[in-house]
Amino acid sequence: MNRLMILVFAAVILALASADEDVDIAKRGVPCLCVSDGPRPRGNNLSGIMWMKTGGYGGNGCPKGWHFCGKSRGFFSDCCKR
């Protein structure tokens, strides 16, 4: 079971890292919670997109035209918003 979870996690990371920037960039990736989403009594909106940190992006891990919007930075990824 642990091997299956590791395999699925690795597949998600590879899918996020290979996301093509020019093909509907806002719909790729995993939704994440931005600071501006805030706590709400009926649940939070996930308006950010989780981006993998790669060499082609800025120091914050977000693509051009996007900004970091999360509460804390991840080791492999950041929550970014357009």
Swiss-Prot record:
Keyword Chloroplast: no
Keyword field contains Membrane: no
Pro-sequence residue ranges: 20-26
GO cellular component: extracellular region; nematocyst
One annotated GO molecular function: sodium channel regulator activity
Compartment(s) where it occurs, according to its Swiss-Prot or TrEMBL record: Secreted; Nematocyst
UniProt keyword terms in alphabetical order: Cleavage on pair of basic residues, Disulfide bond, Ion channel impairing toxin, Nematocyst, Neurotoxin, Secreted, Signal, Toxin, Voltage-gated sodium channel impairing toxin
Superkingdom of origin organism: Eukaryota
Name of protein: Delta-actitoxin-Aeq2b 1
Species for this entry: Actinia equina
